[in-house]
A protein has these predicted regions:
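A general nucleic-acid interaction/assembly signal
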Residues: 1-89
Length: 89
């Protein structure tokens, strides 16, 4: 398993990537949902239930996947959801 510090580093990288992507797609307020989508993708790729259960040898692979993650369909859906919520306020 990854160390707690490595798990925290992966989670921080996920949060940073989510903020970057929400800015790129002009989707304000979707950072948490985007982070969840990235986290889900990493979990599905590595076959674990939690980032903390990731094998130590997969740490670099997971970090690279977080850096490269950019799912247009997911981000478009998050943006349209954020736009709808903004209109209802």
């Amino acid at each position: 398993k990854v160390t707690p510090a490595q798990a925290n580093a992966i989670n921080e990288a996920i949060r940073q990537r989510a903020v970057e992507l929400c800015g790129e797609y002009r989707a304000k307020g979707c950072e948490k949902a985007a982070a969840n989508a990235i986290r889900r993708a990493v979990r599905l790729t590595t076959g674990v239930n939690s980032i903390r259960e990731l094998p130590r040898c997969e740490y670099a692979v997971a970090m690279e996947q977080v850096k490269m993650w950019d799912d247009f369909k997911t981000m478009r859906a998050l943006r349209s959801k954020a736009d709808k919520e903004a209109r209802h306020e």
